[in-house]
Amino acid sequence: EIAQCLVGSEMCIRDSSYLMSSGFEDIVSDQDFPVTERLSKWGAHDHLVFNRLLEDLKTEAAEGTAEEKTPHFRVLQTSSSHEPFEVPFRRLENDRLNAFAYTDSCAGDFVRQFRELPQWKNTVIVFVPDHLGAYPEHIDNLSVERYRIPLLMVGGAIREPRRIDVYGSQHDIAATLLAQLALPHEEFVFSKDMLNPASPHFAFFTVPDAFGMVTADNQVIFNCQAGAVVVDEGTVKGKNLPLGKAYLQKLYDDIAKR
């Protein structure tokens, strides 16, 4: 098995103890790139990090170890789409949107080349942002749009193209992936399989002093410090407020037991 984390910035160094305790054996950070390639505020630009991962995959394929070393779990975090949005690429006039287009092109190039390798047929690639917030500009923490992000799954192991319109949270990715692999996920007590029609489809998010609970029929954000609802939208207004409060309490109860 392979467990690898690749980040072009110093984040892997700062979080190395967490990553190692989580089972990552190979951690690639900005220090693993020549100084001449660390040209952004964050370290190495995204195309260099994707190229590093692609070279590792090509080496495994050439050595005939690609099949032997499965299953493998790799995490690559992009950084060029963060401020100051300076990238070696120019397609759009707006610097923010241009940086997003650059990272998108890096991911697309990686997928196109990865499709030619033997590992592709047994691989699932998950694309998910860690957060939204850089665009539209000036969006704040008390807006539902601040938390609306996509989840994309591609790869040779995907049977057919589909679009699934359900609400979920980042912590639901664990149960969703493990369920497709027929692996247990009970230890992830707050994670649910988003592809299971019997699962409740909702998203929950928190920021300091506020939480949000989102379903198809109601979107609520509650400011805990002010003790006030700041967003209540949808066809069944108010429905998710008590549910969100109960969920937040359950989170605190779980933390208290650890």
PLM regions: where:
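Active-site His/acidic residue clusters
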Residues: 32-35, 53-109, 113, 134-136, ...
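Single conserved hydrophobic/aromatic residue that forms the stacking wall/gate
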Residues: 1-8, 12-13
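Structural recognition of the beta-strand scaffold that forms the well-ordered cores
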Residues: 73-75, 127, 152-153, 203
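Loop/turn elements at helix/coil->beta-strand transitions in domains of secreted/extracellular proteins
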Residues: 63, 67-74, 119-125, 157, ...
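Metal-dependent active-site segment of extracytoplasmic phospho-/sulfohydrolases and closely related
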Residues: 102, 106-143, 152, 177-184
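Membrane-interface soluble catalytic domains
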Residues: 65, 159-258
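Formylglycine-dependent
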Residues: 14-64
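Feature representing long, continuous alpha-helical segments
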Residues: 47, 51, 55, 98-101, ...
